[in-house]
Amino acid sequence: AGPMVNAINGKERLSGYQAALAEAGLTFSEGLVFETTYSYPAGLKLAERVKASGATAAVVTDDEVAVGLLNGLVNSGVNVPEDFEIITANNSVITEFTRPTLSSIEQPLYDLGAVSMRLLTKMMNKEEVEGKRVILPHGFVKRGSSK
């Protein structure tokens, strides 16, 4: 879930999702990819679409959307994580304020900014930049929304 209009984020995430499915021997289903805006109300509306799809889990790219999705599903009688699991991607403080708490991918946001600034400074100084793709360490914080 999240907007696909940003060519860098949306398309890269979708490509990574498709690659992970292929690596696991699973088939990609376009009907299980939901595009939405980054907001709590969008997450509430998303709950209806996700429930109707028959999906049993979601990876959401924004914590606010994930909270809306969680509340929308719980309000409609879905048991999380027993019947539906949710993982979000920013590990902001709101992931700990929900019931159940939201499992999250932990991203090194400070390091992301620092590395980006170093690369930008090198480019501005017309210095050589080796590889423009940097993969930083990340982790998974298991909480109550996943088994």
Kindly label every feature range from the protein language model.
Residues 1-147:
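Bacterial carbohydrate/catabolite-sensing allosteric modules
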